[in-house]
Amino acid sequence: MKVKGSLKSHRNRDKNCKVVKRGGKIYIINKVKPRCKARQGS
């Protein structure tokens, strides 16, 4: 999982990318391509 300061470019990498909020953190999940996973934060 990549940790990024901004997820805007990550969100547009694939059409299956979804933005989810879990426990106060923002995640990008992709069930089709799991290597697209990312979390926002430093």
Swiss-Prot record:
UniProt-listed GO biological process terms: translation
Keywords carried by this UniProt record: Ribonucleoprotein, Ribosomal protein
Signal peptide residue numbers: none
MF terms (GO), sorted A to Z: structural constituent of ribosome
GO cellular component, one term: ribonucleoprotein complex
NCBIfam families linked: PRK00831.1 (NF002021), rpmJ_bact (TIGR01022)
Family statement drawn from the similarity comment of this UniProt entry: Belongs to the bacterial ribosomal protein bL36 family.
Protein name: Large ribosomal subunit protein bL36
Native organism: Wolbachia sp. subsp. Drosophila simulans (strain wRi)
Organism placement in taxonomy: Bacteria, Pseudomonadati, Pseudomonadota, Alphaproteobacteria, Rickettsiales
